[in-house]
Amino acid sequence: MAGHSKWANIKHKKAAADAKRGKIWTRLIKEIQVAARLGGGDANSNPRLRLAVDKAADANMPKDNVKRAIDRGVGGADGANYEEIRYEGYGISGAAIIVDTLTDNRTRTVAEVRHAFSKFGGNMGTDGSVAFMFDHVGQFLFAPGTSEDALMEAALEAGADDVSTNDDGSIEVLCDWQAFSAVKDALEAAGFKAELAEVTMKPQNEVEFTGDDAAKMQKLLDALENLDDVQEVYTNAVIVEE
């Protein structure tokens, strides 16, 4: 763990998410529709839908909105036929970036993603150019002060692969992405509620950015995040606030 605070980064991420709740709801509705279309409308037998519905609950989305999105997906209604496309590229100093999109117009989407990269000092790469630098995992982060021994016992029993304590005292639990919901349920049943719980592309190594480079990198990430077709942006860049 480097010198930056993982806990501070997570709190900043949550605050930013709260500020963009309307956009988050729009993304979740698209994800719910696609998950229901591909795997059916029963969250108990559709892990992808279960994950999306859980995210919607965490984002305080009304249940009626969730149900309508599921119904549209299962029924194949207009608007549910999105295509999943992943773009990969580089930011400042070669930092790795993955951009996951859901789109009904890939020509529009690739043009917008490429423009964001080029405008803010990055460039798009080819398929597979940076994805190998990330692991597809379930990630949980618990607040400093959480009992490490008790959490480790519960996590490993639940099927987690790794438990580690960061320099700032927060505790990170990692699991196979396909086991995410089962591990989450088991940890909550044991009394452990994560401050962050998500399936993510976790970088194998991180690169810290400070000063002007940090500001430039943040502008690129924000530009990508703000595109309507973008669902998730992953990077190995860590913006250090000074």
UniProtKB/Swiss-Prot annotation:
Matching Pfam families: TACO1_YebC_N, Transcrip_reg
What are the record's GO terms for cellular component?
A: cytosol
Q: What is its main location?
A: cytoplasm
Q: Which UniProt keywords apply?
A: Cytoplasm, DNA-binding, Transcription, Transcription regulation
GO MF terms here are: DNA binding
Q: Would the keyword DNA-binding be found if you checked this record's keyword annotation?
A: yes
Any GO BP annotation: regulation of DNA-templated transcription
In terms of InterPro entries, this protein maps to: Integrase-like_N (IPR017856), TACO1_YebC-like_2nd/3rd_dom (IPR048300), TACO1_YebC_N (IPR049083), Transcrip_reg_TACO1-like (IPR002876), Transcrip_reg_TACO1-like_dom3 (IPR026564), YebC-like (IPR029072)
Compartments annotated for it: namely: Cytoplasm
The record's PANTHER family line, in alphabetical order, gives: TRANSCRIPTIONAL REGULATORY PROTEIN YEBC-RELATED (PTHR12532:SF6), TRANSLATIONAL ACTIVATOR OF CYTOCHROME C OXIDASE 1 (PTHR12532)
Q: Which family does it belong to?
A: Belongs to the TACO1 family.
Q: What is this protein called?
A: Probable transcriptional regulatory protein BamMC406_2210
